[in-house]
């Protein structure tokens, strides 16, 4: 509901009090200037302010939850979830240090080889990581098309380079270099910092950071592993179960599209899911007016982009870029999609209309997201607000369902006195470190609780895999 939940902000907003903020209690002084005996006193002061504000603000915050009709989701989802997240943080996840080191070395070899090729083609060395120097090489020395000069030089953003990539192998090498460098710094080198003495990473899971209600992770962030790249996916191989255990990965299949079917009550989409049809092929059949058995791979791929794009309020411009087609073709795809699924068109239009009237969107379970952008004087901001109004109820409902599933899975594991534990939650998947003699029980617990976390007009489907590392189980 707001950007921060810091105790000093809550004290000011709900209690009308000014209390010292974190930065005031822990000023940014050099270590040599900080007397060692001050640290315990500061920590005590910080803990006291946190506890005092939480205690004093309880009634005011409870009233706010009642007023916004979110007390139920707070009591029945968010509070029970804190225990599941605590257990996950305590459990952590094991990392094979030798494999992580080997992964980093392979990335370095690839980076060095690309660097050598890039310098050879450029005719001299330069700082590949400098947008200014790279821009001069591409658009100044090499005279490639599409260069847009700004005050700081030519733009070398990913979107600019991706347009050049199909025709210029040199640009392809630059993009690959960036990808490998990012993987090395963020994962190969970055993860090593967080490995504890027990060879496990004990990250932090946050339940109130994202606007949609999805869980996020920090220190480290394991949500953004680039799984579309083969080398990106390989980072999952360094995460391993402890001895005597395996990983069980349970992943919701197309949960957001299933929620869209339920919330829109679109008969064609509901029928496709209830008859276990290939949803992307079924969409292609409707949009391209061909029998289901005659749908081509390209048509299915394009329909898949439209299916997932609609959930995120994709524009014809965005779809044309994604599929490398003209904007006119993209407009026709979207138009035909809404003709095929009229319930979805009505639902999305009504979602925007209701959000404009109320000032917020709401999930199936009552979670609200304020959308102030809808009343902005800026056209681009209003468009952003409309996209949020369309996709937040869907994304937020998916987040709520995952949280409910986690609570129920964690509860049943304890009730059955099993030693297996949830160790990760990423996007639509749960990862369990399961003892080998508990595998079948855990698989049943996952599938049952995840598929029964919500009752929709279409079935929730969960894919369960077992493996000796995270990649193998996914």
Language-model segments: residues:
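Conserved "right-hand" nucleotidyltransferase catalytic core of DNA-directed polymerases
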Residues: 2, 6, 10, 14, ...
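Metal-dependent catalytic core segments for phosphate chemistry
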Residues: 8-11, 256-288, 368, 372-382
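Conserved catalytic core of nucleic-acid polymerases
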Residues: 90, 202-203, 207-210, 285-418, ...
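Hydrophobic, well-ordered secondary-structure elements that form the walls
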Residues: 130, 213, 251, 284, ...
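Active-site palm subdomain of RNA-directed nucleic acid polymerases
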Residues: 65-77, 81, 401, 405-426, ...
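Short Gly/Ser/Thr- and Asp/Glu-enriched loop/turn motifs at secondary-structure junctions
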Residues: 79, 129-133, 301, 423-427, ...
């Amino acid at each position: 509901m707001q950007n921060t939940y810091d105790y000093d902000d809550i004290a000011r907003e709900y209690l009308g009090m000014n209390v010292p903020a974190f930065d005031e209690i822990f000023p940014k002084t050099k270590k040599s200037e900080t007397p060692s005996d001050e640290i315990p006193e500061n920590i005590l002061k910080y803990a006291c302010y946190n506890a005092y504000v939480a205690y004093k603000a309880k009634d005011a915050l409870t009233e706010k939850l009642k007023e916004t009709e979110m007390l139920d989701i707070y009591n029945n989802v968010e509070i029970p979830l804190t225990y599941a997240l605590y257990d996950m943080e305590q459990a952590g996840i094991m990392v094979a240090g030798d494999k992580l080191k080997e992964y980093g070395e392979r990335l370095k070899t690839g980076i060095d080889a690309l660097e050598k090729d890039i310098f050879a083609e450029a005719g001299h060395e330069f700082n590949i990581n400098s947008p200014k120097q790279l821009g001069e090489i591409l658009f100044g020395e090499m005279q490639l098309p599409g260069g847009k000069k700004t005050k700081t030089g030519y733009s070398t953003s990913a979107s600019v380079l991706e347009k050049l990539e199909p025709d210029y192998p040199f640009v392809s090498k630059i993009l690959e270099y960036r990808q490998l460098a990012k993987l090395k710094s963020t994962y190969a080198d970055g993860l090593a910092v967080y490995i504890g003495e027990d060879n496990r990473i004990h990250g932090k899971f946050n339940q109130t950071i994202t606007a949609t209600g999805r869980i996020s992770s920090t220190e480290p962030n394991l949500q953004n592993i680039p799984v579309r790249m083969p080398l990106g996916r390989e980072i999952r191989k360094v995460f391993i179960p402890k001895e005597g255990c395996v990983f069980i990965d349970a992943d919701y299949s197309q949960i957001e599209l299933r929620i869209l079917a339920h919330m829109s009550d679109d008969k064609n989409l509901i029928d496709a899911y209830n008859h276990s049809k290939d949803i992307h092929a079924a969409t292609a059949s409707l949009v391209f007016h061909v029998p289901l058995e005659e749908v081509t791979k390209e048509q299915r791929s394009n329909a898949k982009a439209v299916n997932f794009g609609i959930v995120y309020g994709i524009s014809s411009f965005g779809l044309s870029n994604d599929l490398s087609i003209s904007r006119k073709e993209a407009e026709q795809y979207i138009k035909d999609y809404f003709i095929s699924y009229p319930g979805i068109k009505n639902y999305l239009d009504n979602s925007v209309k209701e959000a404009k009237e109320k000032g917020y969107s709401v999930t199936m379970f009552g979670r609200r997201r304020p959308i102030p952008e809808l009343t902005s004087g800026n056209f681009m901001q209003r468009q952003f607000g409309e996209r949020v109004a369309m996709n937040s109820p869907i994304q937020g409902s998916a987040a709520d369902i995952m949280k409910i599933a986690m609570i129920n899975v964690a509860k049943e594991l304890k009730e059955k006195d099993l030693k297996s534990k949830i160790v990760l939650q990423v996007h639509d998947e749960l990862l369990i470190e399961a003892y080998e003699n508990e595998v079948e029980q855990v698989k049943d617990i996952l599938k049952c609780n995840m598929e029964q976390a919500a009752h929709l007009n279409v079935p929730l489907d969960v894919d369960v895999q077992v493996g000796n590392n995270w990649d193998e189980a996914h």
